[in-house]
Amino acid sequence: MAVVGTLTVPTGTTNKVAQSSETRNAPAKATDRASSDEETTPSDEPSPTPSPEPSPRRYSGVSAKVIKLRKSDWTDVWLVTLTHRGQSNFIVSPLDARGAEQSSIVNEIGIYKGSVLLNEDEGTETAALKIDADGKWTVTLKPISKARQWTGAGLTGRGDDVVIVNPPSAGLTTVNARHSGSSNFIVDAYTESSRENLVNEIGSWRGEVPLPDGTILVTVHADGVWSFKKS
């Protein structure tokens, strides 16, 4: 597992150190045999059981609404998938435990479908989501592990998205990015210790940018079709 602040995503690796066959099969020393009956070696200790992932939380409604989250969900980092079928504003803003409104996670007009992060910044707490809409909407909170996986060289998508880079980037890696749209095109990369903005443009755009070493997650904010290709 890898952590960005409070953000935890799977990277396809574990923290266990595998022993070589020579080490596993080597005969024990006499002193080791004498103590083995009385002591439990670290390798014999059971591995801690990982905490189960929370199940998805799905909410739906029409027009304005305040969704109060379970208290146990307030500080978790979530992948939030949203839809809206309306003609006017669709704005989703987190509220803290005192009801204070935070920066919106979605601010669009008309029909919308996309995925964004919630509580990715360390210390963030969300007690509720304030929905401003004129049509039907859905909001689904899911564990980060349910995000799309970027496993090959190329990746395509449309609109807002969150993508796990698997395996994480290593060494000098560049990304050729393209966007066909009329509004924002913002791309951020997350490593175990930092977040870096890769692209911040408006409208159609194409270019090549470096992907930070150790990138485990990429977020995209876009209104059109986009594509990435690593090299």
Regions found by a protein language model. Give the residues of each.
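Hydrophobic membrane-insertion alpha-helices, especially the h-region
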Residues: 1-7
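Acidic, Ser/Thr/Pro
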Residues: 16-17, 42-231
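N-terminal low-complexity, Pro/Thr-rich disordered segments
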Residues: 7, 11-57
